[in-house]
Amino acid sequence: MVTIRLARGGSKKRPFYHLTVTNSRNARDGRFVERIGFFNPIAAGGEVRLSVDQERATYWLGQGAQPSERVAQLLKEAAKAAA
């Protein structure tokens, strides 16, 4: 099954996540089909907290990809900010 989920990056104590489209059997930070955005939970100042390619996210959801719980919240937040 294809899922849209977060892949952790960054360094120790400074998380950074990529929104990735991947097979659910792949490792969290492993192989992916496409990166469709990023999420920086500790963004400060002028840094961008969330960036999502809405067109690609809509495409993958239309193809049957299942978002994780957190990604579903982030997609909703991004859609609200874009409107």
From Swiss-Prot:
Record Pfam families: Ribosomal_S16
Source taxon at top rank: Bacteria
Keyword Ribonucleoprotein: yes
Record GO cellular component, one term: small ribosomal subunit
SUPFAM superfamilies xrefs: Ribosomal protein S16
Cysteines paired by S-S bonds: none
Record GO terms (molecular function): structural constituent of ribosome
Keyword annotations: Ribonucleoprotein, Ribosomal protein
GO biological process per UniProt: translation
Protein family: Belongs to the bacterial ribosomal protein bS16 family.
Record protein name field: Small ribosomal subunit protein bS16
Organism: Ectopseudomonas mendocina (strain ymp)
Lineage of producing organism: Bacteria, Pseudomonadati, Pseudomonadota, Gammaproteobacteria, Pseudomonadales
